[in-house]
Amino acid sequence: MSPFISLDELPQGSSVTFYDSSFFKRGSETITLPTPSEVLARPNFIQHPRAENMKLRIPAVFQELGLAVKHSDSTNTIISEGQCLWAVRRFLPKVPVPEVYGWTQENGIAFLYMEYIDGATLKDRWDSLTVTEKEGVCQELKTNITEISRLRQAPDDEFIGNISRRPLSDMVFTGTNFPPVGPFSSATELHDCMSNMFKWPAKVRQPDIDLADVLDPYRDMLPDDCAIHFTHADLNPVNIMVSKDSPCRVIAIIDWEQSGWYPAYWDFFKVEMTTKPGSEWQTEYLPKLLKEPDPDCCEAFYSYVNSYAP
């Protein structure tokens, strides 16, 4: 039987601490989470690999505490990721994710405290794995993906959005110049929105034009009757943590900040578009993990997404 989750079951608030988590059950001494200032005192940025004047924010690691702290000025995204980790561990205990210990905010920055995963990314280990290990890892991932898709919304309250019914956090939308997208009450509403975003350049050129009069050859290619699934939305090998030693095993799926409720086809496209074109992972193993949507859906999705780039 599939587990159901409703919004009122999610932990709420700008500052939440899970005192029943394993972090607070270590020995007899009183233990506390690091303060925001202590978090920010740790190394928090790395150089962007493709932009000389840009740095990337990385989690602060307290390895001695078995703790990683993710932080961002996108406060809703950080809190929603915390809610997601909490929900997956509670309702889908077979899916390996970091345990969440709490979150807080200070000076416009949100801090998410979670378990530090001592492993390697699948991306880093992939080329050194045997065929047997690759097959084993993919079977584990397929099982996890199937398990994730079992989570259900309340039957009378379905929506597309992040886990807390806020706008979608997917980079397909957040990496554009458009305002926040969603939430939606159906796949039809999402697809209509994607179509209007595709048509928007025509509105810029002709402000008086009605978007309904702008031709869109792709709208009818998207399946409005598609099921809504709980989705990670960024199952790139960099977000799959595996054991450092052989035999290689999946130990955690991390970085759930883009996750939420999406059409069932969404995860396939997101994995495909964020991995190296023509790579072994993309061509041979992705089809073993997720069912490829039909060609019309593929054409429409990529035509829309490619048109959204700033």
PLM region descriptions:
Residues 17, 21-22, 44, 49-51, ...:
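Charged phosphate-binding loop/patch that engages nucleotide di/tri-phosphates or the phosphate backbone
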Residues 187, 225, 229-231, 236-238, ...:
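Active-site Asp-x-Gly
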Residues 134, 147-233, 243-246:
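An alpha-helical support segment within catalytic cores of ATP-dependent transferases
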Residues 52, 76-79, 209, 280, ...:
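Conserved phosphate-coordination/catalytic loops
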Residues 38-180:
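ATP-binding pocket architecture of kinase catalytic cores
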Residues 86-90, 143, 147-150, 252, ...:
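Residue-level signal for well-ordered alpha-helical scaffold segments within enzymatic catalytic domains
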Residues 1-49:
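Juxta-kinase regulatory segment immediately upstream of eukaryotic protein kinase catalytic domains
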